[in-house]
Curated annotation (Swiss-Prot):
<feature type="active site" description="Charge relay system">
    <location>
        <position position="171"/>
    </location>
</feature>
<feature type="active site" description="Charge relay system">
    <location>
        <position position="173"/>
    </location>
</feature>
<comment type="subunit">
    <text>In the presence of PdxS, forms a dodecamer of heterodimers. Only shows activity in the heterodimer.</text>
</comment>
<feature type="binding site">
    <location>
        <begin position="135"/>
        <end position="136"/>
    </location>
    <ligand>
        <name>L-glutamine</name>
    </ligand>
</feature>
<dbReference type="GO" id="GO:0004359">
    <property type="term" value="F:glutaminase activity"/>
</dbReference>
<feature type="binding site">
    <location>
        <begin position="47"/>
        <end position="49"/>
    </location>
    <ligand>
        <name>L-glutamine</name>
    </ligand>
</feature>
<dbReference type="GO" id="GO:0006543">
    <property type="term" value="P:glutamine catabolic process"/>
</dbReference>
<dbReference type="GO" id="GO:1903600">
    <property type="term" value="C:glutaminase complex"/>
</dbReference>
<comment type="pathway">
    <text>Cofactor biosynthesis; pyridoxal 5'-phosphate biosynthesis.</text>
</comment>
<dbReference type="GO" id="GO:0005829">
    <property type="term" value="C:cytosol"/>
</dbReference>
<dbReference type="InterPro" id="IPR002161">
    <property type="entry name" value="PdxT/SNO"/>
</dbReference>
<comment type="function">
    <text>Catalyzes the hydrolysis of glutamine to glutamate and ammonia as part of the biosynthesis of pyridoxal 5'-phosphate. The resulting ammonia molecule is channeled to the active site of PdxS.</text>
</comment>
<dbReference type="GO" id="GO:0036381">
    <property type="term" value="F:pyridoxal 5'-phosphate synthase (glutamine hydrolysing) activity"/>
</dbReference>
<comment type="similarity">
    <text>Belongs to the glutaminase PdxT/SNO family.</text>
</comment>
<dbReference type="Pfam" id="PF01174">
    <property type="entry name" value="SNO"/>
</dbReference>
<dbReference type="GO" id="GO:0042823">
    <property type="term" value="P:pyridoxal phosphate biosynthetic process"/>
</dbReference>
<keyword id="KW-0315">Glutamine amidotransferase</keyword>
Length: 189
């Protein structure tokens, strides 16, 4: 299975390193539309959503990602990637990809200094607690009818799935746990 990490900004290397630990996965750093269109799954990493959103448009990557979504290729957005996938962003008129029926609040847990780690119980992902790293993290304020809530932290939605789309407010790539990767890769079957 050919799994790409959008290679324009953010935690690209960390996602690539995790994918390389999983048997049968060809990890690809996807920096152009031609590479994107060859993928069986795509991860949109954390970083700075405004900068990544601009790059998506300026380099024609947005259209390629929209084509992947039309083909129901699994797409997973972590932190900024989740913001890019959202149909609605609170207090922000921009809509980057707009492919997932969620409304997100950017930097909902505060600034960089307010970043934190916690442990979450997410039965759909693992029977064990999962470490979750939140860095200037967003959260999901509301979801549409077809969206499955996977995890909450202090009453706020921090992970969700809609068909082939997965979104996490936190960074599984910054932990030693591969549970979210295995769950995401099963969306392709």
């Amino acid at each position: 299975m050919r799994v790409g990490v959008l290679g324009v900004q953010g935690s690209v290397k960390e996602h690539m390193d995790k994918l390389k630990l999983i048997k049968g996965i060809e990890a690809v750093e996807a920096k152009d539309k031609d590479t994107l269109l060859t993928l069986d799954a795509l991860i949109i990493p954390g970083g700075e959503s405004t900068a990544i959103g601009k790059i998506l448009v300026d380099f024609g990557l947005k259209d390629a990602i929209l084509k992947l979504n039309e083909r129901k290729v699994p797409i997973w957005g972590t932190c900024a990637g989740m913001i890019l996938m959202a149909k609605h962003i609170v207090n922000d008129e921009r809509r980057h990809l707009g492919i997932m029926d969620i409304t997100v609040r950017r930097n909902a847990y505060g600034s960089q200094i307010n970043s934190f780690k916690t442990r979450l119980i997410i039965p759909a992902i693992s029977e064990n607690e999962i470490e979750a790293v939140f860095i200037r993290a967003p959260y999901i304020e509301s979801v549409g009818d077809g969206v499955r809530i996977l995890a909450k932290y202090e009453g706020k939605i921090v992970a969700a799935q809609q068909d082939n789309l997965l979104a996490t407010a936190f960074h599984p790539e910054l932990t030693d746990d591969l549970s979210f990767y295995r769950y995401f890769l099963r969306l392709n079957s």
